[in-house]
């Protein structure tokens, strides 16, 4: 499980902490058949927040819980408690504090979400997210990941989408819902993703002069996928039954997303960078 792999610093065990050096996790889940949702935000010291979010989706009300309320629920349901702050994450934190002090860099460096949209053989679409959020965020900060329509959305009659990037900006466009809405109107997933990212990127730049990172992935009810981004080297994976998983890179070139297969060299370098010793 990605949430359990300590070298992915944007999610679960090994995720980067907030400004108080505490790991706060967010996760969300949606079933496109029944439209049920579940989400947790600001939850501490639980190993797999996406599983807690899925369990919450079984409830008609009280299906989105935060902080202490989410932790009490998880304990009652028997979910595993685990200290999520690793020694490696502490090293990242100390290094960033030093860089902020000595180089006047911004503390908010590093944000990513593990998002997934899946279609099964019966036509059911689900979407989910899990993240430790913005590195050195303020305690209690919540981004788009656990917000239905922002970080994730699923409708089995149409498709599903998930998003990653700067949560405060992604939420402003209800970006995952907007992609699914466009697909419902007849757009394919690639066009829906590209148009939605373009529109939000342009609106943010018009209103304040810049846009944060915006990256999205979607599938339609027929299993076609799309991806769009306003950054460089956004990676995503496509997996089909009885096939090997394929890693792709998306790059924003002249305002449009160009998707290419990731080379083995790129994937090796990716893992080397994540597992390399940290120099403080």
Predicted stretch roles:
Residues 1-280:
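Alpha/propeptide regions of enzymes that mature by internal proteolysis
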